[in-house]
Amino acid sequence: MGKKKNSKAYSEELTDTTRPLLEFRYGNPLFAIACHPEQSVIVSGLATGHMFCHKYNAAELKEAQLKRLRKHDAGSKDDRKKLWEVVEVPGVETSGVSLLWTTKRHKGSVRCICFDADGTHIYSVGTDNVLKKADTLTGKVVKKCVLDPGQNVKYTKLVKSATHPLVLLGDENGNVTVLNSESLEQTNLIKSIHNGDAINDIFHFAKKSVYRYISLGQTTLAHWDSRESNEGDFAIAADDKQAKRKVILSDDQEDEILCGTFVDPEDGEVLVCGMGEGVLTVWRPKKNGLADQLTRIKVKKNESIDCIVPTLEDDGCVWCGCSDGNIYKVHVNRGTIIEVRKHSKLDEVTFLDLDSEYRLLSGGLDKAKLWDSEKSEQLTPGSDADDRVSNSSPSAGKSSESDSNDSENDATSSGGSSDEDSSSDESEHSDASDVEEELVGLTREQIIAELDKDLVEESEDVEDVRSQRKRKHGADLPTNANGKKQKGKNIKPERSMKTHGIRRFEGL
């Protein structure tokens, strides 16, 4: 039996070399953030009630990063220097990032924001219990309503249906308010879903019905129809297991369920939930109707998984934002962590989202980072990629690019530029996760050269075997763009057969 690997060392081995493309630093606590589903736009809401809408050019940001890399000393061992764009909020514009508008949208703090399916409108709700619908590109409010006048209700989750004109609001009392997204009029109220505890998350259960949703709260998972009230459920005895209820609750998980998502929202086969004890629980609706979890995946002991999003790359993985400041990429079927990114050493990861090109956006109370889809070593100009090795497992990534009360016309645009050198703030050097290690010993090319040297002596035998195989099968050996690597894979079995098998003496 092999020696048990130290968990800390193992985590360091998985640390990814991907750098952020962009970082936002906020002067006030960040309470909500979301990416536009079709454009390279990010909207953030702060504790002061202000909202900021930024547009970014990913290609320009990447080019600026390459320029900084060229200036960076190739021989320097300090690869932790920030080489990405840093934008102060509020502050002036920088290269590749422009401020479309900013406004004080709510009295008190902004609690939740979300886009509609095509990103035309953005919805926001604040501690003033006012829901506002605004044009995304101008910031102008087109509709608003006051929720529960006179009630001291705090909203925790805001969701817009991707297919129907529905807006759902979850609050701290465990209620879900359903409104028409066009008129902002209430159409349904589902009360006290999780025994009166706060709604931690809401997401679509599309495989079951376009009107069905899943909510998470305290230690239970529930699913329900957004069109139907659950008033009749309170007349059913708690111990009556046969009665049909409008809200179907899972078993008590004995650990707080903080967030959840489907690994593939289109097929709806596997659901994962982030727990307060640092594990992912795996649920399969077809197995037991979401009555209980089936398996658990350990992510980080004594920490909590506060947010989660699917990668949407058909790789069976999800991104998990953890209270230790790390982002973990978890392969659900394997039950393993395959990548780790460091968001911050001091702050929790409380927000995760994907931009229009599936780049990851992570956020905490003081900053947000938009991560590049390429590894750092792929971006390094003039460096020998064969002499460097990434500590992370490979991941499949997409390399393409993402009123002041009632007079909401005060949404203003601002211009200006900032010094790029500000992005190298030394106090934040330790936050970056792009440190690479030198490979000790022979490089990959040197190893290949040594293998080729050994193969020269037996090249004739190899060719004979190849010709025999061609005659036998009538086809060439498979090749790909990386000819050297494929060649090594094809020759090695032949060498082992001739060295250790009887086939070597077939001609005698």
From Swiss-Prot:
Subcellular compartments: Nucleus, Nucleolus
Top-rank taxon, per record: Eukaryota
A GO BP annotation: positive regulation of transcription by RNA polymerase I
Extent of Basic and acidic residues compositional bias: 491-508
GO CC, any one term: nucleolus
Keyword Nucleus in annotation: yes
SUPFAM superfamilies per the UniProt record, alphabetical: WD40 repeat-like (SSF50978)
Entry keyword set: Nucleus, Repeat, WD repeat
SMART domains cross-referenced by the UniProt entry: WD40
Family that this chain belongs to: Belongs to the WD repeat WDR55 family.
Protein name: WD repeat-containing protein JIP5
Annotated source species: Eremothecium gossypii (strain ATCC 10895 / CBS 109.51 / FGSC 9923 / NRRL Y-1056)
Source species taxonomy: Eukaryota, Fungi, Dikarya, Ascomycota, Saccharomycotina
